[in-house]
Regions:
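N-terminal targeting signals for export/organelle localization
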Residues: 1-43, 189, 197-204
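A short beta-strand-turn-helix
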Residues: 36-62
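Sec-exported extracytoplasmic/periplasmic mature domains
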Residues: 57, 76, 83-90, 112-115, ...
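Hydrophobic beta-strand anchors of alpha/beta hydrolase catalytic cores
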Residues: 63-64, 95, 153
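Conserved redox-active cysteine motifs that mediate thiol-disulfide chemistry
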Residues: 66-83
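Conserved segment of the thioredoxin-like fold in thiol-based oxidoreductases
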Residues: 86-133
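Thiol/disulfide oxidoreductase modules built on the thioredoxin-like
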Residues: 114-116, 125-187
Length: 204
């Protein structure tokens, strides 16, 4: 009986262990109810307000990634996000970063003299703001139980967004952790290219 209990325990934990590899927090792409709202947040480069509707206009697919620049898991994902953006931006794919829990100066230092490879805006600047952010609220809705939730990724299809409502979309594809590159690459391709094989990520 003891051996059976151990086997069951290992079986239950094995999927979690597979996603938490060597300090990574990989998470699958899933469709969730999120009630994602339009926003107007300050651009890291211009110090002016950027409206989300304007940023996504004319795009086929947009990945919004919420991140804290000091977070190791974000630093794991950052080159993947930049790579996917470079690969598909000519086909209508856009990445937008939303910085959290760090000052704008710290975010600028993180990206260095070259700057961010895609548009970045700021939602919060201190760790004390964690539970006050929309980022935190969305994470609760999508079942993200991590402490800081960095990175947290949501995919929007501009052609399907509500044209006038404050809520842009009730449901969206999200990743509650680091991107699984192959999975997300295929998903992006299925949305921005006509000839790519369509992948159907798991729904729950």
């Amino acid at each position: 009986m003891k051996k059976l209990s151990i086997l069951i325990f290992v079986f239950v934990l094995s999927p979690l262990m597979a996603f938490a590899q060597a300090g990574h927090e990989y998470s699958p792409l899933v469709e969730k109810t999120v009630n994602y709202k339009n926003w107007s947040l300050t651009s890291l480069t211009t110090d002016k307000a950027d409206d989300l509707r304007s940023l996504v206009a004319g795009k086929k697919l947009v990945m919004i990634v919420y991140f804290a620049p000091w977070c190791g898991n974000w630093r794991n994902e950052a080159p993947i996000a930049a790579k996917l953006y470079e690969k598909y931006k000519a086909q209508g794919f856009q990445v937008i970063g939303v910085s959290e829990y760090a000052t704008r100066d710290d975010v600028k230092k993180y990206f260095g003299d070259a700057g961010a490879p895609f548009p970045v805006v700021t939602e919060s600047e201190t760790r004390d703001d964690k539970q006050k952010t929309l980022h935190y609220g969305y994470r609760q809705l999508t079942g993200d139980t991590r402490n800081w939730g960095s990175p947290w990724n949501i995919f929007l299809e501009p052609s399907k967004l509500n044209a006038s409502s404050d809520v842009l979309t009730e449901k969206a594809w999200v990743v509650n952790g680091e991107l699984i590159e192959d999975e997300v690459d295929k998903f992006i391709a299925s949305k921005v290219t006509a000839t790519s094989a369509v992948i159907t990520p798991c729904k729950n």
